[in-house]
Amino acid sequence: MEVGIIGATGYSGLELIRLLKNHPQVTNIMLYSSSQSGETINRLYPHLQNEQWKPLKEIDLNKISAEIDVMFLATPPGVSAEWSGPLLEAGLSVIDLSGDLRLTDRGVYEKWYKRPSAKEGLIEQAIYGLSEWNKSTIKTAKLIANPGCFPTAALLALIPLIQAGAIERDSIVIDAKSGTSGAGKSPTSMTHFSETNENFKIYQVASHKHTPEIEQQLAKWGAQPPLSFQPHLAPMVRGIMATIYAKAAKPLSNEWLTDCYNSAYENAPFVRIKENGTFPATKHVFGSNYCDIGFCYDERTGRVIVASVIDNLMKGAAGQAVQNFNLMHGFDETAGLEAVPMYP
């Protein structure tokens, strides 16, 4: 299968290149860029220099259906809203890694993203690509809205508990930490080395745009928004840890929680449940498509505490996009994603 990437020079795009280059079902990768057409990716990024790459191309909708079968959009907000429709009309399947198509309410999107939403009809076509919970609809989709990094970590931890009626659905607090690559490649004072090294900081207090995405998806499972979600920036490049607190809806035990999570993810190759009261760390999933989940029932407070870790560029972006690509086209779900985490 021949695939294309728009936004190949960003961090998520580069991760897509790494994964798709080793995918057993991918025969060709075309890289597209309007700002850097004519450049070669291995000149821009020397870690790719041993591979032979065609120059970055401008998109020509009259030719694109003859060049590729699937397009990955690893682009900033607004680009997918413009390009997804024409790409679908050209006969391609589209996997969008941006937030343009995740929110079904246009007013909510415009409030949180501070920009116009996608055209009417496009959002309705998009399937939310949380691989472990939307497999049946992903398998028949032509357009995937790949989940955000924070929502992926939070949703995988919370859906089993909400589904089982284990927590008070209006008591959820999500306290999340992310590495600097989650902010993208463009340098800012927020991610400057001098600002992040030996530093730990809160940001976008009560205003992060992943908040309505988490609320929208949890509402489908019976949760009652609003919830509290707060991200922090950690002095590391990759990784997310979401520590989640919720009031138990009934007396629980760690044994019950273990059974709940093991049952929910029995057939999920990329979700690993910690045993015997152990908890995950971001290093445990570094460079992989895994989500590791640990948990505890605090009898003293009557709260459930859950820790969920992912690599934000993998399970939080490119890895889950490739997982959805596999599901859409009937490939083994793990194809191209079998690499074990890098450690230390």
UniProtKB/Swiss-Prot annotation:
EC number(s) per entry: 1.2.1.38
GO CC annotation: cytoplasm
Localisation per UniProt entry: Cytoplasm
Keyword set includes DNA repair: no
Annotated catalytic residues: C149
Annotated catalysed reactions: N-acetyl-L-glutamate 5-semialdehyde + phosphate + NADP(+) = N-acetyl-L-glutamyl 5-phosphate + NADPH + H(+)
This protein's pathway: Amino-acid biosynthesis; L-arginine biosynthesis; N(2)-acetyl-L-ornithine from L-glutamate: step 3/4
UniProt superkingdom: Bacteria
Major location (coarse): cytoplasm
UniProt KW NADP keyword: yes
PROSITE patterns for the chain: ARGC
Molecular function via GO: N-acetyl-gamma-glutamyl-phosphate reductase activity; NAD binding; NADP+ binding
Record's keyword terms, sorted: Amino-acid biosynthesis, Arginine biosynthesis, Cytoplasm, NADP, Oxidoreductase
Function per UniProt: Catalyzes the NADPH-dependent reduction of N-acetyl-5-glutamyl phosphate to yield N-acetyl-L-glutamate 5-semialdehyde.
Protein's recorded name: N-acetyl-gamma-glutamyl-phosphate reductase
Organism from which the protein derives: Shouchella clausii (strain KSM-K16) (Alkalihalobacillus clausii)
GN (gene name): argC
